[in-house]
Design a protein with these regions (language model features):
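Structural beta-sheet core signal
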Residues: 18-20, 90, 143, 212
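Glycine/proline-rich, positively charged
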Residues: 24, 28-129, 139-142
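Alpha-helix-loop-beta-strand connector modules within alpha/beta enzyme cores
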Residues: 5-20, 73-83
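Active-site phosphate/pyrophosphate- and oxyanion-stabilizing loops and adjacent acidic/basic residues
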Residues: 5-6, 41, 104, 199
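Structured C-terminal cap/extension of enzyme domains
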Residues: 8, 109-110, 129-262
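Short, small-residue-biased leader/transition segments that mark boundaries at the very start
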Residues: 1-2
Length: 262
């Protein structure tokens, strides 16, 4: 955070998009609107800026949404009027909300400008459950879990596919392959599974921004290069939908912080 503050002071503030976030619960207890507003103020103070572009209410579970909408949002909209942030956002908690239940409620309310959600090659259900509403209402989307441990940890993809095949959720022949997604690594396709994962998420209709984080600076340039590449071949996208479009809750665990992730 101190590095971010110094960085912001060295450039024109309107040349970058800055976001921050606050959780709405502490354990089983919901936070008050005053507490969340105080968190916003503290973030502004630490960053040395008088506003952020996006303020997110973070990891909101379905059972917290009504509290957020009725108690916290009105207070935050007053802070927005004061110029403390430009756009109001909300993020889901994928490990505990694989069906995007919270966001399906949020997409019915007019207060949200941006949402953050999970979407990846083996977790495609946002295509039906979230993106139609965000596209219709022009709500911005930030994609997380595009890579995470599922695609970045050696052997993890193969392990999960074997488990899913054993449960009857995937064909057994897929579990027998050394690289189950080898069809993506072809001429005109991707050079790596991580590259394919970023390109897949980036070019999904309804995606606006793909997030990535890493503990290794060497990952940054390849990640950006992957995101900037063209879509995967149409046949590959169709095959991913045929093989994995029915899956839910796969690859939504927290990552190894040293790994390449999003």
């Amino acid at each position: 955070m101190l590095f971010r503050s110094a960085a912001l002071k060295s450039i024109a503030r309107d040349s970058v998009i800055v976001s921050t976030k606050q959780k709405v619960a502490q354990g089983a207890d919901f936070r008050s609107a005053a507490d969340v507003v105080a968190g916003l103020d503290e973030s502004l103070k630490i960053m040395g800026t008088d506003y952020v572009d996006i303020f997110f209410l973070h990891t909101v579970l379905p059972n917290a949404y009504e509290h957020v909408r009725s108690q916290i949002v009105p207070a935050l909209l007053r802070e927005k009027e004061k110029g403390k942030f430009r756009f109001l956002g909300i993020t889901e908690m994928p490990p505990k909300d694989a069906r995007h239940e919270m966001l399906q409620h949020a997409n019915k309310d007019a207060c949200w400008d941006v949402i953050m959600l999970a979407f990846h090659m083996l977790g495609q259900n946002a295509r039906q459950k979230v993106f139609p509403a965000t596209r219709a209402r022009n709500i911005g989307t930030m994609i997380m879990f595009a890579v995470r441990s599922l695609f970045s940890t050696p052997g993890r993809l193969q392990q999960d596919i074997k488990v899913l095949a054993g449960e009857g959720k995937l064909p057994s022949w897929l579990a027998e392959k050394a690289q189950p997604l080898d069809f993506l690594l072809c001429e005109g396709g991707a050079q790596s599974i991580i590259e394919a994962a970023y390109r897949y998420a980036r070019h999904e209709p309804g995606t606006n921004v793909v997030l990535f984080g890493t503990g290794n600076p060497a990952h940054v340039e390849p990640n950006i290069a992957a995101i900037l590449k063209p879509p995967l071949p149409r046949a590959d996208i169709q095959k991913l939908a045929e093989l994995f479009g029915h899956l839910e809750g796969v690859g939504l665990d927290e990552p190894n912080l040293g790994a390449n992730r999003a």
